């Protein structure tokens, strides 16, 4: 991403050449640093930080597991026993935001990034992330995982097993959309009448969206990372989000006749999501 000064200065050289003159300066988001634009702060290009980041769909990878509990029961009766295994465990989830393309709009922009709703417990933390550097941010959150799973013990059987919490490594891309609205100041080294009405001036103020539109239309300078809109421009910081969270319960159940016989042990596996509507919730965070 080119910084905004590089873009407006390239445009300024092109624009003034259309009128047979040269450009002294352009200003966009920092009118206060130039004595010739300090009196026109009302025209400055304003920078609006996003309320949150926009996340893409998540890619999941196995992140290992931890043992939550075990059970061991003998059913001497003639009816199936439904055993409820109640589990609760306090664990630490980690969340990391990396910035791969920072903003270069002349001023620092920060966002209060919410943790996407993808964990196995309610998560309400936010982290302050600068979109103007590649430093990134990370946070840890203690989560109290509680779950109940049901195990069936057949009649005249000995059942035992374990329940584990499977962790999932989640990765996704994010975008921070920063709004630019206002005007780019440009100083022509000879007076010109941009309005073609005989009104000649050195200093003119051009809507920032027109500046970027002309850069794209006339291939003046690379504007990747900026999106022209009807009433302004979006400057887009991008990066990746990574978290390690508990999402699934894995039950390994063993069963053999009771009293014991030579019959082989039967083993069953069962998986239960702690967030059954994970896909819907992830998409809603977009």
Swiss-Prot record:
Alphabetically sorted, this entry's keywords are: Secreted, Toxin, Virulence
Q: Which compartments does it reside in?
A: Secreted
Molecular functions (GO terms):
toxin activity
Answer yes or no on keyword Phosphoprotein: no
Q: Which GO terms describe its cellular component?
A: extracellular region
Q: Which residues form the propeptide?
A: 267-286
Per the annotation, which location comes first and is thus the protein's main one? secreted
Tell me what else is known.
Answer: This protein toxin may be one of the virulence factors because it shows strong cytotoxic effects on most eukaryotic cells, especially leukocytes.
What's the family? Answer: Belongs to the aerolysin family.
What this protein is reported to do is described as: Cytotoxin is thought to form hydrophilic pores in cell membranes.
| UniProt name for this protein | Cytotoxin
């Amino acid at each position: 991403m080119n910084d905004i000064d590089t873009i407006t200065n390239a445009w300024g050289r092109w624009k003034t050449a259309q009128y047979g003159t040269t450009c002294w300066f352009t200003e966009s988001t920092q009118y206060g640093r130039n004595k010739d634009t300090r009196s026109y702060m009302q025209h400055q290009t304003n920078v609006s930080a996003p309320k949150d980041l926009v996340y893409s769909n998540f890619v999941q990878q196995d992140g290992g597991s931890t043992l939550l509990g075990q059970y061991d029961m003998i059913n001497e009766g003639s009816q199936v026993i439904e055993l409820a295994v109640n589990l609760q465990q306090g664990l630490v989830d980690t969340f990391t935001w990396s910035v791969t393309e920072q903003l270069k709009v002349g001023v620092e922009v920060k966002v209060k990034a919410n943790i996407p709703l993808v964990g196995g417990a309610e998560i309400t933390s936010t982290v302050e992330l600068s979109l103007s550097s590649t430093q990134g941010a990370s946070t840890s959150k203690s989560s109290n995982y509680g779950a109940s799973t049901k195990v069936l013990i057949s009649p005249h059987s000995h059942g035992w097993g374990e329940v584990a919490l499977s962790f999932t490594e989640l990765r996704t891309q994010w975008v921070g959309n920063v709004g630019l609205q206002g005007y780019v100041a440009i100083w022509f080294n000879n007076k010109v009448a941009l309005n073609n009405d005989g009104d000649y001036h050195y200093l003119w103020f051009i809507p920032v969206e027109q500046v970027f539109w002309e850069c794209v239309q006339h291939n003046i300078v690379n504007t990747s990372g900026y999106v022209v809109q009807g009433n302004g421009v979006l400057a887009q910081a991008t990066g990746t989000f990574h978290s390690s969270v508990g999402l699934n319960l894995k039950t390994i159940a063993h069963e053999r006749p009771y009293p014991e016989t030579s019959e082989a042990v039967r083993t069953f596996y069962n998986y239960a999501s702690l967030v059954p509507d994970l896909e819907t919730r992830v998409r809603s965070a977009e």
